[in-house]
Amino acid sequence: MKKIAWSLGILVTIGALCAIVWPSWYPSRPLVTTPSQADIQADQSSPRDLLEYFLSGLGETSLPVIQQQVQRYEQENQGLLIDSSLFAQYVQYKAALSELTLPQASGGLSTQEWWQLHQSLLDLQARYFSAEQQALFAEENRLRELAIEKRRIYEQYGQSEEAQRAWQALLLDQPDFIQRSEATAQLLPQLTQAGQGDTQQRYLARVALVGEQGAQRLAELDDSRATFEQQFQDYYQARAAILVRNELSASEQQTQIQQLREQHFAPEQWRRIDALERLKDNGE
């Protein structure tokens, strides 16, 4: 079984369904941002986009700092769109996504397996959000369901006029925003291209979960994580070499290790490095 990493990317917007629950007007106060967000205008048109905006700062800053930013936003805007409680639920939901598993299939996932994945997502949403709050995911869920249904149609009829007629008939029953949505056309090719190896299958699963932009963001995070892991391995080996130098006193060893840490990592990463050192020292 394969685990799907949780997403930090920008997801499919909520659209008209979300407006049923939350007001369509919103405050325009500037938000606290990380350096990489300085030139990004926060999308406050829906709660989902605003949640993703705050979470996108994770990595440059810590979760507690982001939680403080959300609290400040809540206080300044009377809890419109999102509040601390909803943000906490969303973080828990994202963490649960990291534990979601897929069956390993050499030829890619079947339509039934994609449908099971879809149902697993609905179950997770129901676990962490109220019925009203689940409007956060309404458009994304419907688009995913349609993409899987389109896959089923073309599996049944092949690339034929009959398949095209069946698909068009299904689309006609959908709301206008679904029919117009480019996400429908963008999601299906990713779903129907059965995974060619582990990397692509993972990418397809992420597209189903978080959309194209989210999948790309996760791929970037994979690269960043791999870079960090290699950086830590290099650091840990150099640290080990310092610790076996008997001519150095314990104080001198710690001084050199601290200098080594400063060369490899930013100060905000040091607590994480401490934890990783302890785990590795204990053979975990």
UniProtKB/Swiss-Prot annotation:
Transmembrane parts of this sequence: 4-24
One of the GO biological process terms: lipid catabolic process
GO cellular component: plasma membrane
Localization annotation: Cell inner membrane
Alphabetical keyword list: Cell inner membrane, Cell membrane, Chaperone, Lipid degradation, Lipid metabolism, Membrane, Transmembrane, Transmembrane helix
GO MF annotations in UniProt: unfolded protein binding
InterPro entries: Lipase_chaperone
Top-level taxon in the UniProt lineage: Bacteria
Principal place of residence: membrane
Keyword Transmembrane: yes
This protein's record includes keyword Cell membrane: yes
Pfam families in the cross-refs: Lipase_chap
UniProt topology in membrane: Single-pass membrane protein
Biological function: May be involved in the folding of the extracellular lipase during its passage through the periplasm.
HAMAP family: Lipase_chap
Similarity comment: Belongs to the lipase chaperone family.
Protein name as it appears in the record: Lipase chaperone
Organism encoding this protein: Vibrio cholerae serotype O1 (strain ATCC 39315 / El Tor Inaba N16961)
Name of the encoding gene: lifO
